[in-house]
Structure formats: structure tokens, C-alpha cells
Amino acid sequence: MLITSLRAFGVDVVLFFEVHQPYRLRPDLHRVFPSLPSFEEMFYGELDSAIFSRVAERVYRKSTKILLEAAREVGLKATFSVSGLALEQLRRHAPDVLDLFRELASRGFEFAAQTYFHSLAWFVDGEEFREQVEMQAGAVEELVGYRPRVAENTEFIYNNDVACFLRSMGFSTVVTEGVDWVLGWRSPNYVYKAWGCDARVLVRNYRLSDDIGFRFGARWWDQWPLTADKYASWLESTPGDVVLIAVDYETFGEHHWPESGIHEFLRWLPREVARRPRLRFATASEAAEGHQPRDVYDVPPWATVSWADERDLSAWLGNELQRDAFALLKWLYPYARAVGGDALRLWRLLSTSDHLYYQAIKLGPAGEVHSYFSPYGSAYKAHDIYMNALAALTALIREVWSREYAERLELDDERCFYAEGVRLCSLRELRSADGGFKRRHRDDLRRWLVDVFLLDERDADAALSRQP
């Protein structure tokens, strides 16, 4: 049976703006060693402040005022996804922008959830991912007064498990990339359903999005210059129920400088859309809930997609430098989790996807984009700096480690102790193990406690002797 739209005879235009600024690592971090660096010595505060101040003026203030003007005049709506790190820096450097965001929310704009640290936490630990999303959702609720209904994983990273995990957290709609091999013959311009759960999925129309995000200022492009009326006519002629246009918010004044005409494009686009009866602006949740899903968007975990580069994970995990760095980050997580406090905060800051993005080694347009964002000029330099930061985190953990933290340590599967069908992943489980089992494997267990739980030999012997 043909499923008809609940919002028939029109197309919902969903503008989705991604707002994120990382804390960049200081390139001369190695000079602090062997002393343990402070947060100020580790992160490049001067550069972050300079970049943020420039972007706040060119983008966050000017573009947001343009959107507010369009909201008042033609009823513009859109969806924002703001990382927790961007919110922190807005509070510090541009609190007036937060007031502008609150005014957007009061006029029907929507704010979505994502990971607080714009991180790769999904690939490390499910509960860590949950906590980071909850942190960011809480920050959004504090900002605009409601909990988000729409969520994305960092950089639109998506598979079926991501969608259903976010659905289990209460988010009704998940936003991701409209990948050709996933869609096949189908169009990105419809609402889909996640495989395995009832989450609704909106997928980005990457061609129309990249016309703004990447090609707007490209004089070699046969459609340059891109004007608001031309773009609105493309939207009007696009078949489907929903057109999701998702771009970095920094597109409007930073990636494309004001001299390119990008602000005038942003100013006139809502008006050009408003005068076309077939088009209407909607938030992501309105569009997802206003149309019945047409089919299933099926992305198995072994084929995870994103909106970057080749629509996969290669932007962050595509070469040996990146994979080695990420493996160490992942290895350190249980220890940072056990210690908490500054160690966990530092681990989370280092989980920000940008640090691995800077380590990509790519040619062509993708390589140019990586180079544009990197403050280091070289993937190899970015890797060295990041590994120094992980070394500093390791030193911090070792400096404060104690039996108390060993008691809190919950190991991943790779570091658990396995023998005779028994699996031990914590000191609590060790105490509950059969005494005969512990005697038979005493030497191996002792080495495990020293190497993995970082206990000295006396504490290791005590742990083996202790009963539940």
C-alpha cells in the first residue's frame, strides 16, 4: 500500500547547522616534559581564543542575527547541533551569542543532541557515549529550556546500532548522511526508519548541502555564482517529502568569508523559499514526525557511515597513524574512568574527533579540507603532538594511581582474565572467584594484577588472598 505524507503537497526544507570548536593541542607540548603539563600548558588557549573570537564575530553573531531577521519576517525555522565544547567557549568568549540562540529557540528553532566532546566515544564504550550525549543534552536543556528530541552522533557517524542506542535514550529522530550505496535507487528526500527499532532517520542531501558548504565560492564551478533564487529553484524542483541541508555553521562567514557573498545568500534564501508555495521550512523533528517513513535505512555496524570524505570512517581512522593513536586512547579509557576528575576530563578532551582528523593523510579535495582545518601543517606533526598528549595523560594516571582506583577499574574484554571458562574483569569479580581456581592460576593472576591493575606485588598478593 502506498504510504502518503501527513504533510502532503509540499516539501519540508530542513536547515541543519553544526556548531563546534575544539580545544587544540599546543604544538610545543613536548617542551614541558618530564614535568607533568597543566591544562593550560597542554592546550593552545591563545590560538583557540583568537579563532573563536574571529568566528564569533563573522559567523555566530552576524549569521544568527540574519536568521533571526528571517524568522521574524518569513517564519524561518532550522535546527542547530552545538557541541558542549562550543557551548563552553561561547560562555567564556561570547555569552551574547547564547542569548541569540535562546531567541532562536523562542521562535521555533530546534536544538539537537550530540556528543558533548564531539568525540569518537561510540567506538570506545557505550556508557561513555551515553554520558557524553546526556551531558550535551543537559547543556542544551539548560540553554533553551527543553530536552532535544533529535540526535546525531559526531560527524553524522551512523549505523543501525547507533540509531537504536539513541532511540533507547529517548530520541525519536536520528540524523545522518544520505550515502549512495545505502540508498541505492532511493532518494535521500524522504523519512526513513532505522533497522531494528522505531527511530526515524533523516538523511542529508549531500549534493545540495555541498553546493553551499564546499562549492559556493568555487569559481571553477559551472553554477557559480550561486544565488538564493537559483538555489531555491533547485529546492523547488527536488522531488520528495523532505530536503535536509546540513552544513557547518562556520560555512557562513569563516569557511566562506563575508566577501564571498555568503551572508547575502543566507539573508535572501529564506525569502526565496517563502515565496515558493511548494516549499516550507521545518525543524528536523517536525519533518521526521510529519511524514511516514518510506523504507528502512539499513547500515550494519561493519559498514558505518559518516558525512566526511568518502562517507566512511577514514577521516579519523583511515591510516596507521590514526589507528595507533586511537588504540592508545581506547586503552587508556578504563584507567581514566577509574580515576575520574581531571584524568577523565583530559581523556574526554583527547577523544574529540578533530585530533584524529588532523592526522589524516589524503590527496585531492579531501586532503585540502583536512589541511584547511589543521593548525599543524602536517599529519605527522599532528600525530606526534597527540601522542605527547596521550603520554601526559598516562603520566597523570600513573602519578595518582592507588589501590582505590584499582578497585574501581572495570576492564574491557581484551584485558579480562580468562581460564577454565571463567572470565574476570575487576577486583570484585576476582574476590568472588573460587579459591581453588585462584590457587591454580596464582602466578598468572598475580602478573595480571601487576600489569593490568597497576598494583605492586604486595597489593597483588593481598588481592589474591582477599575474600568477598
Indicate where each model-derived feature is located.
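Acidic, low-complexity, intrinsically disordered interaction modules
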Residues: 427-441, 447
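Short, charged, surface-exposed secondary-structure boundary motifs
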Residues: 122-124, 182-190, 211-213
